[in-house]
Amino acid sequence: MSVAASASRSASTLCSPQIQQGALKEAKVPPHIWAARHWNLGLRLVPGHASVRAGILVLLIFLPSTLCDLGSVYDSSYETVIPERLPGQGSDDPGGKVSYVLLMQGQKQLLHLEVKGHYSERNFPVYSYHHGILGQEVPLLSQACHYEGHIEGVPGSFVSVSICSGLRGVLIKEETAYGIEPLLFSTDFEHILYTMAHQPVVLCNVTPTDSLGDSSQRQGSSKTDELLALSDLWSHAKYVEMFVVVNHQRFQMWGSDVNTTVQAVVDIIALANSFTRGINTEVVLVGLEIWTEGDPIEVPVDLQATLRNFNLWRQEKLMGRVRHDVAHLIVGHRPGANEGQAFLDGACSGGFAAAVEAFHHEDVLLFAALMAHELGHNLGIRHDRPGCTCGPKHLCLMHETISKTSGFSNCSSDHFLRFLHDHRGACLLDRPWHQSHKRRDAHCGNGVVEESEECDCGNACDSHPCCEPTCTLKVGAQCSEGLCCYKCTFKKKGTLCRPAEDVCDLPEYCNGITGECPANSYMQDGTQCDRIYYCSGGLCKNPDKQCARIYGYPARSAPEECYISVNTKANRFGNCGHPTSANLKYEACSNEDIFCGKLVCTDVRYLPQVKPLHSLLQIPYGDDWCWSMDAYNVTDIPDYGDVQGGTYCAPKKVCMESICTGHATLQYDCHPQEMCHGNGVCNNFKHCHCDAGFSPPDCSSGGNGGSVDSGPVGKPADRNLSLFGVGESPDSRMEDEEINLKVVVLVVPIFLIVLLCCLMLIAYLWSEVQEAVSPGSSSTTSSSESESD
């Protein structure tokens, strides 16, 4: 039986959107559409037709094997349940078994669960970026959370849940999938149990590749002592060591939180194992890299190109750092026509052990099936043909249309056995967590600060002022890199290292004992800002500000009439939903959702620099124009022209996935009057960030403000002195200001004295001149008078 994970919220998925043309027919003045010329990426805009003139360049160096397309997913119903754990079972049970009773649709159901193996190496490395520097952390995860089992008395049922913080996972009962997850902040152990209804989910077109080369290049080909006879290969347990990379957009979709991202990936791996167990194979997470500050490679809509770029990055940056059998990239954007790409037979090869999957929705069950499907291609498994079976199911996991409640077919088993035979499966036979080395030892000189290293200057050690080539700090150095490190010493405690960038953002300060700035913190989602708007992700989701960010001041959100004209047209310039297949159309916005489709702006005085395949729509409105943008085929953000999630759309309502819904969806549960004694706000870690004059954790006593997450705030007199860049020291700034003050104190009086002396001299000279002139005038007059006599 094969299943995957629960989803806290489900969403429709994009399938190769077909561009719908057409403008606003009722407009008296025809609308103008502006598109960037492909041969000129500058600021100049050129008028064009309603369609974007774009040439498609298909460049295939290595031809990946799958072209996958997801359908739509939605939650149909839910109920609140309270799972009751039967006494005398659990972690103390040597068998690792536990049972729960819960009420499903009015009937008591007994869940029998058993702990499953660890699907990650102990202390696997997590890499992330901090101001351009790649660092490594070790996650703190419980090793015995994932349980699987069945529902008593229900044939064919299956349960896969994590039980460490409530029950979170999926239940399969009578061909129906249910998601279960704990209700946040419930004091009665309440959970949400919801039906996960769905349409056919994944469509794939397989294209075989012959570019892998001979098997002599594969990992482990020389380990002849580990090779097993063909008859033993199938029964022998196999392990796929998978390294996962999460791109920046998907990281943002997980709240830009490293811990949340790590836990989500661990859950996905555990649930993918529910599928791969059918071929006696376990997927083991050996490492994770999160692109926290942006993607180091180009991640286009075409996942075939993304796979090519990712594989080159993997060969150059990853292979020498962490050993892996396959590496998978999780991207967060809606792809063009394909939801996944993988190299066929790529596992265990040094050159082609890669795959890419799009996770732009929130159906973890569906995504786990997609990951297992793409991994199947890495393991040599092709698409099922007519006649392939997997028990009573009509569609199996490797069919072109994937069912997330089915498993591998008999044909898949044959393909996998052939892969093991042809390539001897050497890399799949070692049990990762039984090895003496959990991962590669720290490699000094790779530019990554790893365990046991104080610093790593890479190839720049000769000129590095703080770090030795041996990856140790130089004598007298306290640090090497970081926002709180200046000239190899820690910046002063309380120094501002990351200022607030929005009214919903919060500042961070150095603690004086490390070179790193604390993790970014901001006001909890749902905090009110600018009177009627709400904070989300550290930004005040004000549509006027969004327009100003795109078009510059004084652009603002357009009147309701413009939104109605644009967002009811159901085309790429105005809609409340992308097509879910090539045969469907864009969705028009209803009256309730009219402000949640495309962002419409007015008072536009400056046009933005239009990127390739971006288009602007200009329509008349009174004496002005209204503007809409389509970021078709651009993946740096979901769609720059869409109204952002969390944006105000009606009193006490916000936009979320093109729907105007209650602001409760932001899950704001802070009571600052009680939690922070009215002297602060709640941050994204659900801790108080205190106002100046009060101290954390609850803002009830005097202090300098801040939170337990922000680092200690400096004294008010020091705060202005801390507003310096990475390359400036607070001490040097203070010294400069002292020098300037001395100069002012000395120069100004001297200048005044000199000026006074000059004035006095001028006055004296002027008086002398007057005295010299006056006697001469008198004598002349007298002489004249004498002569006249």
UniProtKB/Swiss-Prot annotation:
Domain Disintegrin span(s) in chain numbering: 441-525
Disulfide bridges in this chain: 348-427, 388-411, 390-396, 497-517, 670-682, 676-688, 690-699
UniProt-listed Enzyme Commission number(s): 3.4.24.-
Alphabetically ordered keywords of this record: Disulfide bond, EGF-like domain, Glycoprotein, Hydrolase, Membrane, Metal-binding, Metalloprotease, Protease, Signal, Transmembrane, Transmembrane helix, Zinc
GO BP of this protein: binding of sperm to zona pellucida; male gonad development; proteolysis
Keyword Hydrolase assigned: yes
Residues of the Peptidase M12B domain: 238-432
Catalytic site positions: 374
Record-linked SMART domains: ACR, DISIN
Major subcellular site: membrane
GO-annotated molecular function: metal ion binding; metalloendopeptidase activity; metallopeptidase activity
Protein's name according to its UniProt entry: Disintegrin and metalloproteinase domain-containing protein 1
Example of a GO cellular component annotation carried by this entry: plasma membrane
Membrane topology according to the record: Single-pass type I membrane protein
Source species taxonomy: Eukaryota, Metazoa, Chordata, Craniata, Vertebrata
